[in-house]
A protein has these predicted regions:
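Short glycine-/acidic-enriched loop or helix-start segments at secondary-structure transitions
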Residues: 3-4, 60-63, 126-128, 158, ...
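Peripheral (often C-terminal) accessory segments that flank ATP-dependent C-N-forming ligase machineries
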Residues: 258-332
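Active-site nucleotide/adenylate-binding loops and adjacent lid/helix of ATP-dependent enzymes
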Residues: 78-154, 164-168, 194-201, 328
Length: 332
């Protein structure tokens, strides 16, 4: 929806159609003239531009077409190596970039718990979280489809979004993700601008080695024990917080769609829909961040946003406070 919003705001005469893959929920929105189910290649023929957004659709496009273009940027099938978490961790380790200790089965784990588990091959969504005991690990569904990693303490995830051509990064933007949904690691809720030369150097080293062409987000955690950033993964797709990058760096939309606009200097933002999804206990805890954010990002009109508060149990006084804050800050 971030791309659609910017196309309609700054583009000239774009007609947008949404799409979803079989098995995915259909998302209707006023941004789209129509929404269709993409069952085969014929569903996307005849369009000037087809831009997959999630992991499932990006993988499908790369497998069906091998390479596809969005304006002057090619996305190559070879990028799917980044979806294979054990392989990309091994490659990055060989480049001299710090990585977490990673295990492909529970029996191989030889480090103190907790460990972080996630999909072995990126499929979008899926189980992820912390396990503090082997009994907890054994209760996980589809254990053979997961990897288990050394837990790097700390809530902050550092990201560098980029567009690259043949291994050269042509534009990028760094951020720090201070709050995620789910809490243990997921999509950004509270995010701030950030810059560190080591993150730039590590990401450039990885992208060069991959000869990466396309777009993605490299993610890191900071390890106090190592006194260094630890590579976590590359999301070789559009990332959940990309609108924050659009706000601060107009080169992303210029390269992808030939659209130019003046970027703003937005220091921080909260994604309201995900903030609400955290539940009221976490919302109470992070009210200061809500009040201090430079920008609120949400993808529904204000009426439906406020109605969403009634779907979760929130103390009346807190609900009234949050509603007032959102209404007062509308349009920022």
């Amino acid at each position: 929806l971030a791309v659609a919003r910017y196309l309609l705001k700054y583009g000239n005469g774009y007609v947008l159609h949404g799409g979803f893959m079989p098995g995915e929920a259909m998302t209707k929105h006023s941004y789209y003239e129509k929404v269709l189910c993409v069952k085969d290649k014929s569903a996307v023929s005849g369009y000037d531009i087809v831009l997959p957004t999630g992991a499932k659709s990006t993988r499908w496009m790369a497998e069906q077409f091998g390479e596809f273009r969005v304006n002057d940027i090619s996305y190559c099938k070879e990028n799917l190596l980044c979806f294979d978490k054990p392989r990309i961790i091994s490659l990055v380790k060989d480049l001299g970039v710090p990585v977490p200790k990673t295990f492909e089965n529970i029996g191989a784990i030889d480090i103190p718990l907790p460990v972080f588990y996630k999909q072995k091959f990126e499929e979008g969504g899926g189980p992820r979280g912390l396990a503090s005991s082997f009994a907890q690990l054994e209760q996980l569904q589809s254990k053979e489809r997961l990897i288990y990693q050394e837990y790097i303490p700390g809530a902050i995830t550092y990201g560098m979004g980029f567009i690259a051509k043949s291994g050269d990064i042509i534009t990028s933007f760094q951020h720090e993700e201070l709050l995620s949904y789910p809490i243990q690691g997921g999509s950004a809720v509270y995010i701030r601008t950030f810059w560190d030369e080591r993150i730039r150097e590590y990401t450039e080293r990885i992208i060069k080695a991959l000869q990466f062409s396309g777009w993605g987000l490299a993610e890191y955690k900071y390890c106090l024990k190592r006194q260094d950033y630890v590579f976590m993964e590359i999301n070789a797709k559009l990332w959940a917080s990309i609108e924050f990058a659009f706000m601060n760096n107009s080169d992303f939309m210029r390269h992808l769609f030939g659209i130019d606009y003046i970027a703003n200097n937005v220091k921080s933002a909260i994604f309201i829909n995900r903030f609400i999804a955290l539940g009221w206990r976490q919302m109470v805890r992070y009210v200061p961040q809500l009040l201090n954010a430079s920008k609120y990002i949400y993808y529904h009109n204000s009426g439906s946003l406020i109605r969403s508060f009634t779907s979760i149990t929130i103390p009346h006084k807190l609900k009234r406070l949050l509603k007032n804050v959102l209404l007062q800050r509308r349009g920022l």
